[in-house]
């Protein structure tokens, strides 16, 4: 019996996603590889520019710090895309060794968890800034934001340890080396007991990833922005809702882009039919690539009207990511809040 394995991340294609010869069909393979290469080129340039502007050309504030780390998580993901694309072009053959198999997938997992955690942190920060302005003025500092960022990276790294443990390479006896998760605990892969245990471990890893990397952050973000929107409406502050629009754009783009990935992971877990799995895999790769490349651009253009685009790029960055509008709302709310 074959070992219990899964693509785990979209870096490899499950055996169920191939045609009768065991090789991914040419059209989806070419589309996926092209999307990954284009995302690498555009994402490296755009995210690199964002990081440079936020780090060296803007004032160090809570907002710029959180956005810097969010975009850093996107930038890390883009650096792995060429290796994924090469694997797809070589019929899912992994030519970079077992160490990089573990490292790249673990790094991709870290960036995934970090990005959703930073989106959650930004929404919670916006919640406190709008609904608890006095507390925010007393505690909301760049040093506080730096500590939050450090904890997020540590937590994302801890949650990604399973990819260092279970990810490995193996020969599929068809001339290809696969980089996949092996959830079998032990060397006796024929044992039904080990097969059952492996299936339970696979299910536990999927549940942990879906719960902590998607569902719970989604509920936190929805709650925070619902309360923020209600408060802003009550106080008539929607004219100053630029940061709110930026955050909402980030949230929508992230969850729309990551939903196909979690759907695909669920189909792999349940050993669904090949066609739905293949479609969701291709969609997941394209949407995740879209998320790492386009989301930062969306923040920029939803953060200010088109007239500001006629100004310098630096002015546009400052207008989008600065705390000025948030501070104005805080001062307005603070004047109406009883201490």
From Swiss-Prot:
Disulfide bonds join 101-179. Residues 1-30, 87-103, 166-209, 269-283 are extracellular. It is a multi-pass membrane protein. The keyword Cell membrane applies. Glycans are attached at residues 5, 19. The keyword Disulfide bond applies. One of its GO terms (molecular function) is G protein-coupled receptor activity. The chain crosses the membrane at residues 31-53, 65-86, 104-124, 144-165, 210-230, 247-268, 284-303. SUPFAM superfamilies: Family A G protein-coupled receptor-like. InterPro entries: Formyl_rcpt-rel (IPR000826), GPCR_Rhodpsn (IPR000276), GPCR_Rhodpsn_7TM (IPR017452). One of its GO terms (cellular component) is plasma membrane. It is found in: Cell membrane. Residues 54-64, 125-143, 231-246, 304-339 are cytoplasmic. Keywords: Cell membrane, Disulfide bond, G-protein coupled receptor, Glycoprotein, Membrane, Receptor, Transducer, Transmembrane, Transmembrane helix. GO terms for biological process: inflammatory response; phospholipase C-activating G protein-coupled receptor signaling pathway; positive regulation of cytosolic calcium ion concentration. Its main location: membrane. It comes from the Eukaryota. Belongs to the G-protein coupled receptor 1 family. Orphan receptor; could be a chemoattractant receptor. This is Probable G-protein coupled receptor 33. It comes from Rattus rattus (Black rat). The gene is Gpr33.
């Amino acid at each position: 019996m074959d070992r219990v394995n899964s693509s785990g991340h979209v870096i490899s294609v499950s055996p169920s996603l191939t045609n009768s010869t065991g090789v991914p069909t040419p059209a989806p393979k070419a589309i996926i590889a092209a999307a990954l290469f284009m995302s690498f080129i555009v994402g490296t340039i755009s995210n690199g520019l964002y990081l440079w502007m936020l780090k060296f050309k803007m004032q160090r504030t809570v907002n710029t710090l959180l956005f810097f780390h969010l975009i850093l998580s996107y930038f890390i993901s883009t650096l792995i895309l060429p290796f994924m694309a090469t694997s797809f072009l070589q019929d899912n053959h992994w030519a970079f060794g077992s160490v990089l198999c573990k490292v790249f997938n673990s790094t991709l997992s870290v960036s995934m968890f970090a990005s959703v955690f930073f989106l959650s942190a930004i929404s919670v920060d916006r919640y406190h800034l709008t609904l608890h302005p006095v507390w925010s003025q007393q505690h909301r500092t760049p040093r506080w934001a730096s500590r939050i960022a450090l904890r997020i990276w540590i937590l994302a790294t801890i949650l990604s340890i399973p990819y260092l443990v279970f990810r490995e390479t193996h020969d599929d006896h068809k001339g290809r080396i696969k980089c996949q998760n092996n959830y079998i605990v032990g060397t006796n892969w024929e044992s039904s007991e080990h097969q059952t245990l492996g299936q339970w471990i696979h299910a536990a890893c999927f549940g942990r990833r879906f719960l902590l990397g998607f569902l719970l952050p989604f509920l936190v973000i929805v709650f925070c922005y619902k309360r923020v929107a209600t408060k802003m409406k009550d106080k008539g502050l929607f004219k100053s809702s630029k940061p709110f629009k930026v955050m909402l754009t980030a949230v929508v783009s992230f969850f729309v882009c990551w939903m196909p990935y979690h759907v695909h992971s669920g189909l792999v877990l349940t050993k669904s039919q090949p066609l739905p799995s293949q479609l969701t895999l291709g969609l997941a790769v394209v949407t995740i690539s879209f998320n790492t490349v386009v989301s930062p651009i969306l923040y920029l253009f939803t953060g200010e009207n088109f007239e500001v685009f006629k100004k310098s790029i630096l002015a546009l960055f400052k207008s989008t990511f600065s705390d000025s509008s948030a501070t104005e709302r805080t001062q307005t709310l603070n004047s109406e809040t009883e201490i």
